[in-house]
Regions:
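Exposed beta-sheet edge and beta->alpha loop/turn motif
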Residues: 106-165
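Glycine-rich phosphate-binding "P-loop"
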Residues: 38
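Short solvent-exposed beta->alpha transition segments
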Residues: 42, 48-49, 64-112, 118-119, ...
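Bacterial signal peptide processing site
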Residues: 31-33
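Hydrophobic helical h-region of N-terminal Sec-dependent signal peptides
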Residues: 16-24
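C-terminal motif of bacterial Sec signal peptides marking the signal peptidase cleavage site
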Residues: 26-29
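Bacterial N-terminal signal peptides that target proteins for export
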Residues: 2-16
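Short helix-adjacent coil turns
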Residues: 54-66
Length: 165
């Protein structure tokens, strides 16, 4: 003689299946989250891209690309000449920027950075390593350009390493 399971067991089984199904649908259906403020998010992405472009231009010793990111200010002309001196002095530059924080206040953008890198004069010589922290000051909305620097940034290592030798 065969007995049917009590109704409570069948109800429990169906309830479990429904809950598992709802969890699966929720997990797969809500996986794509759009930014709350899309214009600010797009601007943030442009700042990050400008930082990556600056890093790449410096590592590849690409003076025109480096120049394109700078506002025409006297402080940045000095920065650019220091970078060009690095390009002429070192055969190989490896640099890693890490963005610690980005603060956007109207048209003023501050990117707080940590960095580490190695600079090698020639293949026969050993490389010099350095690390530090600084702030890249950017400006703009659609086009992001460097307007200043603060702190210890890697540009101008040729003169710094000559002084410490």
């Amino acid at each position: 003689m065969r007995r049917e399971p009590p109704a409570i067991n069948r109800l429990w089984g169906w309830a479990t299946l429904i809950v598992i199904g709802m969890v699966c649908l929720t997990e797969t259906g809500c996986s794509k989250k759009t930014p709350k403020y899309p214009e600010d998010h797009a601007r943030f992405q442009r700042v990050v891209q400008a930082i990556k472009t600056l890093e790449t231009a410096y590592v590849n010793k690409d003076a025109p690309a480096f120049h394109e990111l700078l506002l025409p200010l006297e402080q940045l002309e000095i920065l650019e000449s220091e970078a060009q001196q690095d390009f002429a002095t070192f055969s190989t530059i490896h640099l890693d920027f890490t963005v610690d924080r980005i603060v956007i206040d109207g048209n003023r953008i501050s990117a707080f950075m940590s960095w580490q890198g190695t600079w090698q004069r020639s293949i026969q010589e050993s490389s010099d390593s350095a690390r530090g922290h600084g702030v890249l000051l950017w400006s703009g909305n659609q086009v992001i350009l460097l307007r200043g620097v603060e702190g210890d940034l890697p540009f101008g290592m040729a003169s710094r390493l000559n002084r410490s030798s």
